[in-house]
Each structure stands twice: as C-alpha cells, then as structure tokens.
Amino acid sequence: MSISIKDKKEELLCRLTDFTKLKGUGCKVPQAELLSLLDGIGEGIGYDCSISQTKFPDIVMIQTTDFFFPLVDDPYFQGKIACANVLSDLYSFGIEDCDNMLMLLACSTDMTAEQRQWSSKLMIQGFNDQAICAGSKVSGGQTVKNPWPIVGGVATSILKTNEFIKPVNAVPGDVLVLTKPLGTQVCVNFHQWLSKPERWEKINTITNAEECEQVFNYATLSMARLNRVGARLMKKYNAHAATDVTGFGILGHSTNLAQNQLLPIRFEIHTLPIIKHMKKLEDHLNHPFKLLKGTSAETSGGLLISMSRENAEAFCKEIYEIEKQPAWIIGDVIDQSSNYDRSKNTSIILENPKIIEVEPNTNF
C-alpha cells in the first residue's frame, strides 16, 4: 500500500491541535487508574479485542473500538491515522480482514462553521479512504458536537474460531518482534514546539526546523501505516501472541500481554528502536516523556509479537521485503515456572537497553 503526504494547494484553514490539549493515544486514562476503574468488571483490561460467541457453531465476532483527539494538524491524515489505529487491535489477533467499520466523530464547537465543515469533512474522507485501503468499508457511525474534535470508530470481523490468534500462547524461548519504531508521540509534541517560541528555544541548540519536519513527516506516515501485512505474516510464521503498542507505551502493553499468557513467563525487552533524534531531545530535557522507560504513549504503533526466533527472523526479513520498513527483535520470553504463579507474569525493560535510532524512511 502506498501512503503519501497530500500535496496542499492551499493552507490549512486551522490547526487541529489548537483545539485540544490531549493528543492521540496520549488521551488514554493511565493504566493503573484504568485497572482500578475496571475492578470487578470482566477480566480487567483484558485483550485488545472482545471475543463474542455467535448463535452459529464455531463462529465468533471479534470487535474493537478506539477514538482520540487530534495529534496532527492535517485533518485528512488525522482520519487515516485514526482508522489505522482502530484496525490495529484486529491485526494483533492475526486478523487480516475487517468485515465492517463504524466511524465515531465529534465536530468542534470551538471552530468557526467554515473550519468545522472543512476539518470534519476531511477527517471523514481520510478515515474512509484508509478503511478502503484495508479492504473494509464504513457502514455507519455517530457524529456529535464537542469542544475538542474526536475521531475513531469500531472494527468488526466475523470468523471461525480457528481463524485468529488468541494472544495467550507465548512460550519460553520465544522472542519479541516490534513492527514500528517508538517515539511517535514525542515526535508530534516536539513538532508542535516549532510554533511555540518559548518551547522551541529549549531545543533549538540541538535540532532545527528541517530536521524536526523530516522526522514528523516520517512519524505521520508511520502512524497512518496499516499493520495489515504484519497480521498476515503472524499467521504464516505461527505467532503465539501479540498486541499493538499505543497509549500505555511499550512497557504498559507488553506487561498487559504478559499477564494474559497461559504459562508463567516474563518478557525481557533488551532493545528499543526509536525514531531518530528523539533520544537526544529526551536526554536534553531530562526525559519528560519517559520514552526510554517504555511508558511514553504511542499512537497507532506497531505490533508486538511473540514467536520462535527462527520464525521471527524470517518474519522481519519478509515484512521488509514487502513494505520496505524494518521490524526488530527487541526481547525474549523467559521461563518463570519456578514461581508457579501466572499472576506474576510481567514485562521489564533491561537496564541500559540497546537503542536503535531509526532513520526517517518515507518510502511507504
């Protein structure tokens, strides 16, 4: 699939990010707070998707929903990113095809009528175009008024019980694969500092506008990129479990995935692929986003997949051949059978992890 930043014949009528304080998946309720809210409800945070039995034998409905506030100013790309983000939960189950999508949209009451019409129409177009790219369709949804713009949706697949990968079967000896670099939320925040002189002055000695625009364009394309190829290759290479990395960061989502496993295991993350320049900016400001701690939010991030090392190496090779974007082996699945207590399943980032600075490659 080809993705490109749209050529603009005219300036943006407004900046979407001027109408919200929280941005992208950074709007999620913190993981610890969410766990307390869900106490006594179902299985807590649980899986990325709901699994519902239908009235037909061996047929299930897999469903997910997600929405957020704008994190880029271009409404068309905001729609594409939102759609890709919704679909990623299905893709983390190894489900390549989404049967139906609904769109959730809030039009900003803080905008002028012209700005609201312009931005809402382009967000809808971007979301719908991305759904079509994914081989799906938008059949309905809900549109409301709200001070902050919102875009997201619902994704549904109907399939047989043996046609998806339940995220519970990681085994000791597996490795962890990540299909997109970290640092999207950090990159978006730094890019917005370009228009805020008092903040830009804090980092203009170690970066420049050209560098900032380059990595921001890369982050935008990365967030808009579908994880669909990864989902297909998960099946081909016998993945045992997966999640997508979004608002809880790499550590939060890997911990949740570890806690869903049937065996007593621990995930150890030894490598962090990070969009180039994000580490130096984090270091310069004394780590305000906690990117190296693994708790920085990501928006429409990559798949984190547990599979055998041999299959992981083949997976990384093939996904690069298809998409011209790298994937990385970033961790190991460690046996914790001596504990005999699955409730202690967890994920950690090892001390002084290897940092891979990922070059901005916009060849999507």
Curated annotation (Swiss-Prot):
InterPro entries recorded: PurM-like_C_dom (IPR010918), PurM-like_C_sf (IPR036676), PurM-like_N (IPR016188), PurM-like_N_sf (IPR036921), SPS/SelD (IPR004536)
Pfam family, one: AIRS_C
EC annotation from Swiss-Prot or TrEMBL: 2.7.9.3
Residues the entry annotates as binding Mg(2+): D48, D89, D244
Gene Ontology MF terms in the entry: ATP binding; metal ion binding; selenide, water dikinase activity
Membrane-spanning parts: none
Entry's Gene Ontology BP terms: selenocysteine biosynthetic process; selenocysteine metabolic process
Keyword line: ATP-binding, Kinase, Magnesium, Metal-binding, Nucleotide-binding, Selenium, Selenocysteine, Transferase
SS bond list: none
Catalyzed reactions: hydrogenselenide + ATP + H2O = selenophosphate + AMP + phosphate + 2 H(+)
The UniProt record lists the keyword Transferase: yes
Record-linked Gene3D superfamilies: PurM-like C-terminal domain, PurM-like, N-terminal domain
Active site: U25
Record-level GO cellular component terms: cytoplasm
Cofactor(s) for this UniProt protein: Mg(2+)
Site, as annotated: Important for catalytic activity: K28
Record note on cofactor: Binds 1 Mg(2+) ion per monomer.
Binding site for ATP: K28, G46, Y47, D48, D66, D89, G141, Q142, T143
Similarity comment text for this entry: Belongs to the selenophosphate synthase 1 family. Class II subfamily.
Function: Synthesizes selenophosphate from selenide and ATP.
UniProt subunit comment: Homodimer.
Stated name of the protein: Selenide, water dikinase
Gene source species: Dictyostelium discoideum
